[in-house]
Curated annotation (Swiss-Prot):
Component of the FACT complex, a general chromatin factor that acts to reorganize nucleosomes. The FACT complex is involved in multiple processes that require DNA as a template such as mRNA elongation, DNA replication and DNA repair. During transcription elongation the FACT complex acts as a histone chaperone that both destabilizes and restores nucleosomal structure. PANTHER family: FACT COMPLEX SUBUNIT SSRP1. This is FACT complex subunit POB3. Pfam families: PH1_SSRP1-like, POB3_N, Rttp106-like_middle, SSrecog. It comes from Debaryomyces hansenii (strain ATCC 36239 / CBS 767 / BCRC 21394 / JCM 1990 / NBRC 0083 / IGC 2968) (Yeast). One of its GO terms (biological process) is positive regulation of RNA polymerase II transcription preinitiation complex assembly. Forms a stable heterodimer with SPT16. The SPT16-POB3 dimer weakly associates with multiple molecules of NHP6 to form the FACT complex. It is found in: Nucleus; Chromosome. Residues 476-502 have a biased composition (Acidic residues). SMART domains: Rtt106.
Amino acid sequence: MVNTDFEKIHLNQSKNYGRMRIADSGLGWKASVTNNASASNNAPFLLPSEEILASQWSRGSRGYELRVQTKNKGVVMLDGFDVEDFANLKQELQRNFQVNLEHKEHSLRGWNWGKTDLARNELVFQVNNKPDFEIPYSEISNSNLTGKNEVAVEFNLDGANSKAGDEMVEMRFYIPGTLENETTPAVKNEENGEVKEEETEEISAATVFYEQLKDKADIGQVAGEAIVSFSDVLFLTPRGRYDIDMYPTSLRLRGKTYDYKIQYNQIERIFSLPKPDEAHHLLVIQIDPPLRQGQTKYPFLVMQFAKEEEIELDLNVSEEEYNDKYKDRLKKSYDSQTHLVMSHCFKGLTERRLVVPGSFQSRFLQPGISCSLKASEGYLYPLDRCFLFVTKPTVYIPFSEISSITMSRTGAGGVSTSRTFDMDITLRGSNQSHNFGSIEREEQETIENYCLQKGLRIKNEEKLAKAMLAKAMNETADDDDDADVDMGSAGDDDDESADDDFNSGSDSDVAEEFDSDASVSDAEMSDSNQEPPQKKPKNE
């Protein structure tokens, strides 16, 4: 058996290069040991010979690229070949796998319009009958109709451990025009012999492309059977009803307009919370990266269930598979309230901790309190390690990020007569804060005590205002006492007897010195107070 090796080859656009080997049993690749590749990335890649269908040779980003079309493993991209490798590579593929190496040239016109070809393993965008670029279906996470003639295609994102950098996350195709879609076949009326013509319905070309891409890329379904499925689940965000299919490593949300695929490693937290209305239960899923509908992002999925709704189901796995993989995580069959069953399935398949209410209880013995965030009304849940506001927008505030919490209440004339209060949560290291308003006054003491138990810094503006007012009043009283002491006997004028020597009617020395009329006698003054004499009548 003769093997042929090629050095410094990159597999599926990986940053690490390695060695590619062709043998009669198949094709293999292994990362180079000297390339600082981590142990997790050093696992060899093996492609059996029976999987290989076709191969193409074209220019790549690191030289020349070999694209291998497979039966069940998508498209395999191997980049980094030299132009001299073409003849040897073609000979080896033909000798070992009876596969012809086809030479393809890419279009370099730079046009942004062309034709799409939905091939077996990838979407090919062609310009002037030459491939302009290819998108493997395995790289497509979601696709949605964002308009009558527009289709958005979202791509998988690299893992959280990869270096931060620029990355294409979405591409949109504008597809004008309509196509005829047959809806009703021709029917002959036996009574009068008339033939009813078949009815046709026009459908947009964008819709046809979207449906075909969804089928090709398996966006609406996953190879294999779902482990468990839930139908017609009400979502508060994003709004609508979705069917949920849960697979070993991912789940599907299928709605009337949007379909989503969510990997379990995207799920960060799961909250199971009873609604304070005592009629519903909420299941909140935090995901990163978030779901997207156009420009709108949804980092939280909020499901609502009737509290008394029940479901009965069995896992769609064999007894052997259940014992090997799921025995310690799931039950073989369920017959209980729907929210309990779904919470247990999410916890078991994602292997994430299920967050439930802690020790906090409102005055109505509920784990949440009614309040408002800006113009939105909802419920605030003080949990063991965080605050969570639902439903729209859903806000997650871990205690570790809280700098301080300010309680404020405003009434007329500076006196607190309001029936509600506001709670402002300031975050560490930023000026960002969340203001929760319209909280019932009776809940304030309970929330304060709970926050103090969690070691959070509390500021009560009402208590501060009362303390400042009391301090100001004490200072005013002290000032009055000091003023009485400084005035001495002057403060006792009311208790002293009248001054016998004082004659209010006599002229003072000051008047004699400065008033030229000071010598006027009392008699003259008394005369001046009398009425003036009447005028004598004129002589006629």
